[in-house]
Amino acid sequence: MKEGIHPKYEAVEVKCHCGNVIQTRSTKCADMQVEVCSACHPFYTGKQKLLDTAGRIDRFRKKYAKNNK
């Protein structure tokens, strides 16, 4: 490898909202935040979980509840 042409490959922490912290290496920014990781994702845990992004489900139900009455 040539000297000085490659980006730095440094250790970073990926922090999940569930509290899980994953150590990895990257050429990108420092620490990262994610909403879902392998410790809390329904596919990996086998548990059904509803992810509500900024109340979108409630707004949808409120909007279309008028039509059902």
From Swiss-Prot:
Q: According to its UniProt record, which cofactors does this protein need?
A: Zn(2+)
Q: Which UniProt keywords apply?
A: Metal-binding, Ribonucleoprotein, Ribosomal protein, RNA-binding, rRNA-binding, Zinc
One GO CC annotation? ribosome
Its GO biological process annotations read: translation
- GO molecular function annotations of the record: metal ion binding; rRNA binding; structural constituent of ribosome
Binding-site list for Zn(2+): 16, 18, 37, 40
Record has Cell wall biogenesis/degradation as a keyword: no
Q: Which Pfam families match?
A: Ribosomal_L31
Q: Which InterPro entries does the annotation name?
A: Ribosomal_bL28/bL31-like_sf (IPR034704), Ribosomal_bL31 (IPR002150), Ribosomal_bL31_A (IPR027491), Ribosomal_bL31_sf (IPR042105)
Query: What does the note under cofactor report?
Result: Binds 1 zinc ion per subunit.
Quaternary structure per UniProt? Part of the 50S ribosomal subunit.
Stated role: Binds the 23S rRNA.
**This protein's name:** Large ribosomal subunit protein bL31
